[in-house]
């Protein structure tokens, strides 16, 4: 049976989304101590500087992701950046390209806003996530944004092409 997925902006307080985020929180809590979980709550996800997206597979919520625009800081030499947050694809929906498509959607949103740097923090033991980010061109970097370098987190960066040609190719 052919299945299709659609990615679109979504309200983070939608009941299906809050249930998925609660599932993600439980998963992260099973892997890391509370001080190593850097979770944006629903209030923060609804902020104007956050773009939140949901992926639906045959109408069912399959995943979500957000990007938060940040002003520059010392860790980025004053450059504005977008931080990938709350990225998740349900385990039974993986292997269909949903995660990669969500990531491309976030990158496209940053390009629309003329932001050429995407950063993220993920857990070192989340091997599927690390593989996804590295396959998408993200490279290891030092901690940023006040995150502690605690040995549990991995930090990644990707330069985004802001030229008209780069935007069309994305």
Question: What is each residue range found by the language model?
Answer:
Residues 12, 119-122, 130, 134-155:
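Conserved catalytic-core motifs of GNAT/GCN5-like acyltransferases
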Residues 2-85, 90-91, 103-105, 109, ...:
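Acetyl-CoA-dependent GNAT
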Residues 97, 114, 137:
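Short glycine-rich hinge loops at helix-strand junctions in the catalytic core
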Residues 96, 100, 104:
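Residues forming the Rossmann-fold NAD(P)(H) cofactor-binding site
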Residues 103, 110-122:
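Conserved GNAT acetyl-CoA-binding A-motif
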Residues 102, 126-129:
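Conserved short alpha-helix immediately C-terminal to the canonical SAM/SAH-binding motif I
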Residues 90-92, 96, 124:
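Active-site acidic-Proline motif in GNAT/NAT acetyltransferases
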């Amino acid at each position: 049976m052919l299945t299709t997925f659609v990615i679109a902006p979504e309200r983070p307080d939608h009941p299906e989304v809050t249930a998925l985020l609660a599932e993600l929180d439980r998963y992260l809590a099973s892997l890391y101590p509370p001080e190593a979980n850097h979770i944006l709550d629903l209030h923060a996800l609804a902020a104007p500087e956050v773009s939140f997206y949901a992926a639906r597979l045959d109408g069912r919520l399959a995943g979500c992701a957000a990007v938060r625009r940040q002003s520059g800081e010392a860790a980025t030499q004053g450059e504005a950046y977008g931080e990938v947050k709350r990225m998740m694809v349900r385990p039974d929906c993986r292997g269909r390209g949903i995660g990669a498509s969500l990531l491309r959607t976030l990158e496209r949103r940053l390009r629309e806003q003329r932001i050429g740097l995407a950063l993220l923090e993920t857990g070192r033991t989340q091997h599927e996530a690390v593989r996804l980010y590295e396959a998408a061109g993200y490279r290891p970097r030092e901690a940023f944004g006040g995150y502690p370098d605690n040995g549990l987190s991995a930090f990644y960066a990707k330069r985004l092409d802001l030229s008209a040609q780069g935007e069309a190719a994305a």
